[in-house]
């Protein structure tokens, strides 16, 4: 038996995509956001209470968040309410919209698809955890490259107890698209697999060429068309760190999301490295499901389930960090400043390559 709130969310997902509902894990089906508890009471009081709102565990003083001067004196230009109060579990609305706008700016192909609005996570690692909780059961197959970040092992081998299946990341000096194809070919029709792809790749730094990205997307869609049920997590932690003009500039998510009902796409990304704010811990998770409407029942339910997982673990992510990132994204100099840092990083990359040219013994390392 599910909680009535979970039942309601499950019905919203099934109404638009029975296939997407079938991909949820047992926890994914059980989880819900407690929309009728203290949080909804507080939201209602915020709108309707004329003088007093005693519904949530914060204290006010002089119509602002009660605070210590020794704290707020360190934050010039930020009000106590922006720095110290709780953010919604799904994230500040203005940040979610600002990140959505950034996704569309960076990925023009996304203009043709309808995705969820990004939900704010406590960094990219947290987004990986949310994705696993929503879609991976013990014993499920998780497909990922042999060159991978060790956090995948913690999340999917240990936390969810999935069966990890590795494909060789490289085919010579190129992305091993045939290896992905071969790994997916072992998934029988009707069976679910959770696929993790990360570009630029950690630890190799490799970013697919444009034609490799197109071929990889087609392989994923081909297997969805033949009946494999795929949840594809695109880990865009290092998005934007492209140092070769031939590299695919748009996220793989933009090529595969909303293209087939047997392929549920997830984009995990973060301000961490895109905005050079490693310790602020602001990440995002976005869903792409075929035939789901932006703002429609399915995405509202998916966002609520993600918010429920956040509520159950960290409750909500730092409002102060979210305010800082939201203001940065709203700054008219944001894209120019980001491009300048990417230029510096690109110069460092090329210098390493130049030095290694005189050391052929390291040719396989870079």
Regions found by a protein language model. Give the residues of each.
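Conserved core segment of the aminotransferase class I/II
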Residues: 4-16, 258-343
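Conserved core of the PLP fold type I
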Residues: 82-232, 239-259
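Short, solvent-exposed loop/turn segments at secondary-structure junctions
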Residues: 57-61, 125, 149-150, 200-203, ...
